[in-house]
A protein has these predicted regions:
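N-terminal "domain-start" segment that seeds a small globular fold
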Residues: 1-20, 40, 104
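Thiol-based oxidoreductase modules, predominantly thioredoxin-like and allied folds used
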Residues: 55-73, 88-99
Length: 157
């Protein structure tokens, strides 16, 4: 599993997302949840997406593994994101980001043997992973790092 572009995941609406469609743009993956202290980061994620959308794809990945803070159905998640934060960036189906049922996307993002860069553990909701325009992991950022932080934006373009 050396290539991000070969990994399969569905959108919140159940349609396949082809990461290969995003070659030439950076991708920011964020595990998201509706009932988290960091949920307000949806606003900054949307701001970041709008500001850099010619060069950046933002992908929210719902996960219910941290404090059961994303219990909603696909329809509930979509409505929450649109009504409360005007989210227009991609949201995937709900997946596990750690553990024995970890989704292959997160197996790639968190394991050096897959991404070629570094290993990490997803510690909480709104942890961010930035991938460059060639599908290579740049770095990860803990929840406390705001989406609009220069730690992230300096790598976009």
């Amino acid at each position: 599993m050396g290539n991000l572009y070969d990994i399969q995941i569905n959108s919140l609406q159940g349609k396949p997302i082809n990461f290969g469609d995003f070659k030439g743009k950076s991708i920011l993956f964020v595990n998201v949840a509706a009932k988290c202290g960091f949920t307000a980061q949806y606003k900054d994620l949307e701001k970041l997406y709008q500001e850099y959308k010619d060069h950046l794809i933002v992908i929210g990945v719902p996960c219910n593994q941290f404090g059961n803070q994303e219990p909603g159905s696909s329809d509930e998640i979509q409505e929450f994101c649109q009504v409360n934060y005007g989210v227009s960036f991609l949201i995937t189906e709900k997946v596990n980001v750690k553990g024995s049922n970890q989704h292959p996307l997160y197996a790639w993002l968190t394991k050096k043997e897959n991404n070629g860069k570094k290993s990490s553990t997803v510690r909480w909701n709104f942890q961010k992973y930035l991938v460059d325009s060639e599908g290579k992991l740049i770095d990860f950022y803990y929840s406390i790092t705001k989406p609009t932080s220069s730690k992230i934006t300096k790598h976009i373009l």
